């Protein structure tokens, strides 16, 4: 009989219960035990949902209070030494210190860092994208001295929880090669260094280079110990996630798989090697030959490899087919799925497993709460719970015939037919505009050097101009005002007055702090993508379709179901009002077409490039309206531009061609004196710098503080021609950076980028921070800018 399972399940809960519990814990409103109780309740509920859907195993090890990679850092005993843990701190406290950093009161010394016995500020672990998704993981830090040991009982406790509830258990681990790949080599501290800095040194300042793959021999015994423990606890199967098999791996990493998995196989554990997100290509045959009990392949992203996997995987091994899309919300086409599965089922019915393509972490929990969606559109969708139901339907259709699930199949087919024929999906006017787009619609009128001179004459900004990325703290009062307006409890005029008052507060605070280019603070915006999607045709919004971005941060991606257009101006009123309150330049704040695309659930019935260009034209219209309203600086955020890169380098150029063109189309309809900014975060750009330069933004701001300006070196080596604002402090941590710390970062930046082209700004928007820490950090940032204006020629 075919087995069905899931690679993972959403953690936050249907009502974001984990988010609210985490934030209460961080505010000191509940105890650690209270948070653990919420975790137990959510795990029990999610396991019950899996069993109710007919899954043969529940998955254990996918739950995390912040991030599953951070769970592994503790499980494997490799918490970075720079945090200075003495061994007495509670495990959960150490976990959150790694994730969020720790503030301190000790003064800074001449080294430019805060440190000392009083608990210096401890910057959080770097955070970056999980492959090409919108989920963020915490980056492990490795040095040659990094050791590993089994240091947490959490995984085993959760397996015991599930078994005590009567569930058959499949555990999931990030595989050893992927765990090492996800980390970074960090600097060794020179023993003679007089000042023990709280963060890693950049290369060249005391670092002894090494390859983290060299740590594999120290790591494997701990994995073996974990597998032995799980087997002894009655866990029959362990899913080993090795998605790096879909990457362009160096030869040494490929070669390491065979030896590593022979070591792991010696434990006697049944291992399911799980791959997803990309084609295995040359790694497929090797994956089929590894000494594991089964292999999972992503048949949604890579349907062409399914038959190869079925042919090459030995008949006695399990083939797990990711046949339901774990990353998007559209209902599965049962006829296409069954057509793909039947040849495989005929070959290996007893050793065929069905699953989502990847963990369901990337989709909302359930459609049950979506009472606001019209029934036609709702019928086109499937969230995590519904996707489990689709697996059950496919299992029974294969094993017992379609008649056994005739009702379910009929409903799925009717929904698909409705979507294909619905007039709401296609807009002839959008098609006409795309067809008539001029060839030069993606080019500014003049080159950057000409524009820069015009803009400098217009704005007369000081060197190292200080600004922010866009959003300011979203207080409980702001959120309550928006919620009351959405519920119809307050009228439109009252709401507008309240938002204007918040904008006025933000403008006043920025002027008092001494910022040079201001923003309106975005109090009216719930999310940088959702806000725009709500005002664009072709989008629909869920009531409770939340997915985890990082930690407690959840986003509610819009669903792009049809052609995109802009019925009316979206931001002009708020930005123009903010500009009326100050003589300083006010930035218009927009989200770029690629980011809107990447952070939405995108229609799958046309190429993503076509949808991106539709969005670009809508943003272009908004840029033109802002310019007409007198807004001279317009920021078009594209934090997701690198996230969209295919995982295989051979496919990069095609993606970058349409992605950068979409940005240029959105930004190029303005005069030379209008300054276009863009912002990118969580990104490493060195391998795509020509394409970043080709976007031709007048100013780019990027996240660099967590990497100690490491990301900026590539811009300097490339001689990046335009202006750049490297983030000088990490907004994801409540820690307030010292002035000297930011001065040091700016001095490092000025060593690789011409000082006249540098801006001063935080890493990202300040929406998730509180006002006291925001004002303190920005005051220090402005002072840092003042100092470097005086010290750097």
Predicted features along the sequence, with ranges:
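Domain-level signal for soluble alpha/beta catalytic cores
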Residues: 1-193, 208-793
């Amino acid at each position: 009989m075919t087995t069905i399972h899931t690679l993972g399940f959403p953690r936050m809960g249907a009502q974001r219960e984990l988010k609210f519990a985490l934030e209460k814990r961080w505010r000191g409103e509940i105890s650690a035990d209270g948070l653990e109780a919420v975790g137990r309740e959510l795990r029990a509920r999610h396991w019950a949902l899996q069993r109710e859907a007919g899954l043969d195993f529940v998955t254990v090890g996918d739950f995390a209070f912040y991030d599953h990679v951070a769970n592994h850092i503790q499980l494997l005993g490799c918490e970075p030494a720079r945090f200075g843990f003495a061994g007495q701190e509670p495990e959960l406290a150490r976990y959150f210190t790694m994730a969020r950093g720790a503030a301190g009161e000790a003064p800074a010394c001449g080294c430019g860092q805060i440190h000392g016995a009083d608990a210096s500020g401890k910057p959080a672990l770097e955070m970056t994208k999980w492959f090409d998704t919108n989920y963020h993981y915490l980056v492990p830090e490795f040095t040659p001295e990094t050791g590993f040991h089994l240091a947490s009982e959490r995984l085993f406790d959760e397996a015991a929880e599930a078994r005590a509830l009567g569930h058959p258990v499949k555990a999931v681990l990030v595989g050893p090669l992927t765990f090492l790949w996800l980390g970074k080599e960090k600097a060794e501290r020179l023993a003679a260094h007089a000042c023990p800095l709280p963060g890693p040194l950049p290369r060249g300042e005391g670092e002894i280079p090494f390859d983290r793959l060299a740590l594999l021999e120290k790591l494997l015994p701990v994995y073996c110990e974990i597998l032995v423990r799980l087997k002894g606890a009655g866990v029959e199967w362990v899913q080993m996630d090795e998605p790096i098999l879909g990457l362009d791996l160096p030869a040494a990493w490929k070669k390491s798989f065979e030896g590593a998995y022979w070591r792991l196989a010696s434990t006697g554990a049944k291992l399911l090697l799980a791959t997803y997100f990309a084609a295995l290509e040359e790694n497929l045959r090797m994956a089929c030959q590894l000494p594991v009990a089964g292999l999972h392949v992503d048949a949604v992203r890579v349907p062409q490899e399914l038959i190869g996997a079925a042919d090459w995987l030995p008949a006695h091994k399990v083939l797990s087919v990711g046949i339901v899309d774990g990353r998007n919300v559209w209902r599965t086409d049962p006829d296409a799925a069954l057509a793909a599965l039947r040849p495989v089922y005929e070959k290996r019915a007893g050793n065929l497993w069905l699953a989502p393509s990847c963990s369901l972490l990337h989709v909302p929990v359930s459609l049950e709460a979506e009472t606001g969606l019209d029934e036609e559109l709702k019928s086109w969708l499937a969230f995590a719970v519904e996707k489990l139901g689709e697996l059950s339907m496919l299992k029974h259709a294969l094993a017992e015939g379609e008649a056994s699930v005739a009702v379910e199949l009929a409903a799925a087919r009717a929904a698909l037919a409705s979507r294909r024929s619905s007039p709401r999906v296609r807009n002839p006017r959008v098609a006409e505009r795309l067809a008539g787009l001029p060839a030069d619609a993606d080019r500014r009128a003049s080159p950057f050097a000409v524009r820069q001179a015009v803009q400098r004459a217009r704005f007369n900004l000081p060197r190292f101009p200080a600004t922010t990325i866009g959003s300011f703290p979203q207080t409980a009062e702001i959120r309550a005002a928006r919620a009351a307006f959405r519920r119809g409890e307050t009228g439109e005029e009252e709401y507008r007055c309240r938002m204007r008052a918040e904008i006025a507060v933000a403008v006043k605070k920025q002027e008092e702090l001494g910022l040079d280019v201001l923003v309106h603070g975005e109090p009216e915006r719930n999310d940088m993508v959702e806000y725009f999607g709500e005002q664009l045709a072709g989008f629909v919004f869920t009531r409770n379709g939340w997915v985890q971005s990082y930690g407690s941060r959840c986003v509610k991606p819009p669903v792009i179901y049809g052609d995109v257009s802009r019925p009316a101006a979206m931001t002009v009123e708020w930005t123009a009002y903010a500009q009326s309150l100050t003589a300083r330049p006010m930035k218009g704040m927009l989200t770029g077409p690629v980011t809107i695309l990447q952070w939405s659930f995108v229609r799958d019935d046309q190429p993503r490039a076509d949808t991106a260009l539709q969005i670009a034209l809508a943003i272009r219209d908004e840029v033109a309206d802002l310019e007409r309203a007198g807004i001279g600086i317009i920021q078009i955020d594209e934090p997701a531009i690198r996230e969209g890169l295919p995982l295989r380098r051979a496919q990069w150029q095609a993606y970058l061609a349409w992605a950068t063109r979409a940005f240029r189309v959105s930004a190029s309809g303005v005069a030379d004196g209008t300054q276009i900014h863009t912002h990118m975060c969580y990104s490493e750009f060195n391998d795509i710098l020509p394409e970043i330069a080709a976007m031709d933004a007048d100013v780019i701001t990027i996240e660099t503080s967590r990497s100690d300006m490491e990301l900026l070196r590539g811009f300097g080596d490339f001689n990046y021609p335009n202006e750049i604002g490297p983030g000088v402090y990490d907004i994801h941590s409540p820690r307030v950076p010292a002035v000297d710390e930011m001065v040091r970062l700016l001095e490092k930046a000025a060593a690789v980028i011409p000082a006249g082209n540098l801006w001063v700004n935080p890493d990202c928007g300040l929406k998730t921070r509180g006002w006291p820490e925001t004002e303190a950090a920005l005051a220090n940032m402005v002072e840092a800018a003042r100092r470097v204006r005086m010290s750097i020629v």
